[in-house]
Amino acid sequence: DDDGRHYFLNMLFDWRLENPGFAGTVIQEFDAKARRLVGQRRHFYKGTALGVCEGPQILKKDGWYYLLCAAGGTGYSHAATVARARSLDGPWEDSPYMPLMTTKDDPSNPLQKSGHCCFLHKGEDWYVTQICARPLTQRGNCILGRETALQKIEWVDGWPRLANGTHHPELSVEVEADVLTPVCTDHSETVTFAPDRSLPVSFKTLRV
């Protein structure tokens, strides 16, 4: 925070047999020097009707705390939600443009399962990264598993909103040349193997 204090946010899970599931978000102060949690853990946000409130993170901007959460699970109901408050103690107000992002109502969108966003900005230009997947057929298998994409956002009446005015992500987004700095190096290679042999171990990975 502005005063140098740190906080740890986490999803709360309800293990009771009669009502198992996600139960909102908790916050606790983190002592950076001692590298441990201190003080009382507080349950401070219950989530939305989309359910499965997880992956919480907070941005402070213009005197507001913005709580960005993943919602709906990581399947085809995946979404991102935003709430804000003047204090970490609340009260928290859900965005009128809820959800910030989802494709649960847009099965033809190429970036399915979109949600779990993270804010970033370059000067006055604001963006969110997102988790998504590209199915081979409508709502079918996604052979590349989870992928990462970028969307441009605008601030409308103090709320973040996708720049296209909807909550549906776009496949192509224009950004300034200096916004994204490549960090990958060229690791291309040519591999030759016989059709009746096993794939090289470098071709194998866990399915996500």
Language-model features: locations:
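Carbohydrate-active catalytic/glycan-binding domains of CAZyme proteins
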Residues: 1-208
